[in-house]
Amino acid sequence: MLSRSCTLFLGTLLCSSVSFGQTESTAPLNLTLATPVDSVRFQNHRYNEFYRANRDFSYISPNGELGAPSKYVINGELIASYFLLASPKSRLSIAVTQRFMARTRTDRSSPIRTPSFRLGTQVFYRLSSNVTRYRYVEAQFFHHSNGQDGDTFRPNGTYNTETGDFSTNYIQATYNWGTHFSQRHGAYYNLGYRWHAPIFNSSEGLTGHYGFGRVLGQATYRLLARTQPEPVSTVTTERMRVTLQASYAVNQLDGWSLTAAQRRLNVELSVWYIPAFSRDAGIFATAGYYGEDPYNIYFNDRYAFVRLGIAAGFTRYTDELRK
């Protein structure tokens, strides 16, 4: 039962990551050589690639978060973005995004129990005409739920992590900037704020215990390479990425001061590598600390962890435009 469940979960997550995370058609595309880099069409085209490249990766991780209070068989997250507007004619882009995180426990029958579902919209707007030193802003609105509707608390007053309801809605705004030098390297940074606004519905028992307001930031360095020697190829792909992500809860938390980093800080350092023989999948290693576990109703868990596995979603940059 355990082997069969793991195989099914692993295969589904990997196939979905490649098929939907990139949302690329396999049909022949009508392409034309890119216009000069100072053209508006090329600027919008390149920024649409930045929006995709700077997303989080889908991943699968055998044994999940090593160091977590619970033991896992395999964990993973599937991230799929469907760009409704991503035209070379517009500096505005809009995507509908779904994020599905599942942790398969080592308990009898390997239950997943309370997976995390996040469904929302992302809006991107280009601020600069520079494609080597870029700047843009992003706004998000997401609904986050664990798909349960049971009582949030057990009779003894503790959180019901098996069937307890967890849901919240948040808006997020970030300022994003970075560098991109084809065939060599690039960097990406962002600063922003996530707010679980009280005007939206959320589950009971979260006020004073959950990070409703978070300052967040990210720093990324990536190595790039042509897929083939010039002048044959106009495509550049990532070979390695190093990412530092951090967020800090700034709202009132009962029993915790504003400087209590052990409860308010989430931080992750990840190294990602894509082999030359792979199109968009690679391996990764992450070390981090959760002062608030992002896995829905398990938010009270605090722990340091290591995560190893396979990731999908590396972006390829092209100097060709769709007609």
What do these predicted regions represent?
Residues 1-40, 318-323:
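Cleavable N-terminal export/targeting peptides
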Residues 23-84, 311-315:
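Short glycine/proline- and aromatic-enriched beta-strand/turn motifs that initiate or cap beta-hairpins
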Residues 25, 253-255, 260-323:
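Predominantly the C-terminal beta-signal and adjacent terminal strand-loop region
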Residues 34-54, 87-263, 291-292, 301-304:
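Outer-membrane pore/translocation modules
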Residues 76-82, 122-126, 268-270:
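Short alpha-helical segments and helix-capping/turn motifs at coil-helix boundaries
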